[in-house]
């Protein structure tokens, strides 16, 4: 679903920056944050808005050179999605473990830890 509004100036500026990146030379988050005086959380929110509201397929490299880019083919998309897939698997594992812990048993036996 796309949003029925225009991009904010900040969204447009961030989009322009990321658009100039490539898989080989992604745009570092620090560069974008520094240029527009944004916190890490603000940039993450803008990137999420661009993805969800405007359907821009922004991905990120988590290793050097790290940063944001828009994939130009399926190989680049797969490379950019790999860190997100690993993160989801880790979070699913954490969720499963936390949900499976018997809280009463934990608190009754916490002194044994």
Language model region names:
Residues 70-80:
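Nucleotide-sugar-dependent glycosyltransferase catalytic core
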Residues 18-25, 39:
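Short helix-capping/hinge SLiMs at alpha-helix to coil transitions
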Residues 62-72:
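Minor-groove-contacting beta-hairpin "wing" of winged helix-turn-helix DNA-binding domains
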Residues 51-62:
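A short, conserved structural fragment
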Residues 1-16:
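Short alpha-helical segments that sit at the start of domains
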Residues 78-113:
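Long, low-complexity, charge-rich intrinsically disordered regions
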Residues 38-49:
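Short amphipathic alpha-helical interaction segments
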Residues 28-35:
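A short acidic, leucine-rich amphipathic alpha-helix
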């Amino acid at each position: 679903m796309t949003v029925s509004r225009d991009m904010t100036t900040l969204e447009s500026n961030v989009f322009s920056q990321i658009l100039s990146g490539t898989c080989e030379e992604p745009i570092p988050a620090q560069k974008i944050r520094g240029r527009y005086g944004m916190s890490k959380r603000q940039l993450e929110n803008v990137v999420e808005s661009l993805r969800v509201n405007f359907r821009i397929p922004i991905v990120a490299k988590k290793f050097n050179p790290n940063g944001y880019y828009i994939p130009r083919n399926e190989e680049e998309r797969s490379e950019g999605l790999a860190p997100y897939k690993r993160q989801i698997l880790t979070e699913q594992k954490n969720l499963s473990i936390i949900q499976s812990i018997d809280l009463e048993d934990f608190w009754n036996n916490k002194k044994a830890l």
